[in-house]
Amino acid sequence: MRVERCLIDANWGASTEVVYQFCRHSEFAAVLTPSHGRYVGAASLPFSEYRRHPGDRVGHNWRIPAAANGRAVRHLVYDTNYWKSFVHTRLAVPLGETGGLSLFGEKAEAHRQFADHLTAEYRVKTEGRGRTVDEWRVRPGGGDNHWFDGLVGCAVAASMQGVALLEHAPAPAPKPPPRKLSDVQKQKRLEREQRGGYYGL
């Protein structure tokens, strides 16, 4: 399997510049993207209402702002609450159903540590600004959640590469109506006349 997109968390202030430098100078710079998860709660401005600026790339609850601050590397910003809910919803889909995410094998113990990371946070339904969102919080005394963050990043990276659930996929472009042979011949005749010669069909 070829890796087409790899996000690297650049949110931790002490390592932000190191992440940007690595992404800029790596031999894999074409697939590396510094990423910043943003907590978008019920009272926050949702990603769908951000004002788009020239050069921005906007996707499903993520965006890549135009390059700024003298940085040669563009970065990704995504709604962590939305994407954490997205991942947990995928895990809750019954095995074999469309849109599900499952783990390999039959031995639950093989995935215990991974499951601990995925359950180190819990969601709280919160209302504000006329909408209801899940806000994710770390469990009191909860353990590490790094692999949960990593899985969320994988889902966002897949979205960047065009992977989408059917309900989130962009509508296909309409097909042009079929052309009659006589119309094609007429168009070719006109093009030849404009180039300075008419030879008939």
Annotated model-derived regions:
Residues L165-A173:
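Mixed-charge, glycine-rich, non-catalytic linkers/tails in nucleic-acid processing enzymes
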Residues A115-L166:
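Extracellular low-complexity, Gly/Ser/Thr-rich intrinsically disordered linkers
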Residues M1-G130, Q161, A173-L201:
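Mg2+-dependent endonuclease catalytic cores in nucleic-acid-processing enzymes, primarily RNase H-like
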